């Protein structure tokens, strides 16, 4: 679909359809009022007759409105004006796109971006409209023998902005929105792939393809033989029970004109399937453990998005591919592992494997002398208990970095909330036999997992994103969400300078 922006009066638009808002109860938005005036009260008379209340998501398609050059006018219910928030705005956009496709419109001019959303500017409204549109149209049917027939005639969507001065802002919002949507789709596609196909080698092949597609990207794949030489015994232990080789994909993006500029490093947990190992998970819902690689998928999607944008940064994305399976060679509860850092870990539960993979990767990335490191992982069920399925968790050893990520989450509407990393939680990780245990008990499980990781991130500014509750959905809408690609790209946009959305 093609997106563009323009600034003009609604009555002068020659289009298949104009989209305008109506508030509850039966109150016209400013743009709808203009059309009503041109049409000598035609629209308001329909509302008085009760054809549309203005409740969120209600739609009324009008044909040949007097005085209006466009063929049709779509009235969109937006609820009560003072209650129009971010979530409702995006839901309205998605419902509008679905309706436009159902009506057979090939193009439309959308004035919903002129609605007032508290605390949000034109850039945000246009970018979120692009992202919501792309997200609403996403479908994963790669393995359907009969593809569902979906009617999608809409080919062009024009967003109207209030003044010509905001055209550049709108165009930039479209550029960012399309790049982010591309990254979100890549993340979703990886996450939704079945684990018999999307194993660590498949992750590595996708990383190589990214390097083939973009000159600014190079990819290095590290297999088990090289990991052994590096001393990554903790990472290797997790994959021992699987016949699929563990592979770490290092994706390097160079966009900074200064070749000596320190890179930002993103690390993604890539457990392509997590059975729990010897500490086997319950059978119910185990199929969803293919989503335990969504951290790596989000890093992959982020790298694709920034390559499309050409951000003037150096960024390294690491996909920590691995599969946790039971077997005669699998690691066991009671094992003591020597990590790449030299610290030892007593394994109390083989289903707390993500941290055992990530700890070695966090040590590995020291060689890049990073500006900062952000790891992303579907790490703990405790995070789901704490924050549910709406907000990701942020934990960090560096206050400014934590604030940056939370701020980026607010800007992008891909929300995250900071949890503490107090010294007291480290007490729960003590082991009588090793430097630490790999679990700290049920209390504060998301925090103790991050405390474990922090022991391997002392040489740089580091943050941890626990996306266990936000990376995928269960039930009828089952599938990867593509989060937190929007958050990560916003963080990097802000870091890049000059492309900051708030400028």
Swiss-Prot record:
Name the record gives this protein: Cytosol aminopeptidase
Reactions that this protein is recorded to catalyse: Release of an N-terminal amino acid, Xaa-|-Yaa-, in which Xaa is preferably Leu, but may be other amino acids including Pro although not Arg or Lys, and Yaa may be Pro. Amino acid amides and methyl esters are also readily hydrolyzed, but rates on arylamides are exceedingly low; Release of an N-terminal amino acid, preferentially leucine, but not glutamic or aspartic acids
Protein task: Presumably involved in the processing and regular turnover of intracellular proteins. Catalyzes the removal of unsubstituted N-terminal amino acids from various peptides.
Gene this protein is translated from: pepA
Protein's GO biological process: proteolysis
Cofactor entry: Mn(2+)
Origin superkingdom: Bacteria
EC number: 3.4.11.1, 3.4.11.10
Cofactor mode of binding and number, as noted: Binds 2 manganese ions per subunit.
Chain residues that bind Mn(2+) 2: 269, 274, 292, 353
Single GO molecular function: aminopeptidase activity
Entry's localization field: Cytoplasm
Active site, per annotation: 281, 355
Species per Swiss-Prot/TrEMBL record: Vibrio cholerae serotype O1 (strain ATCC 39315 / El Tor Inaba N16961)
Family: Belongs to the peptidase M17 family.
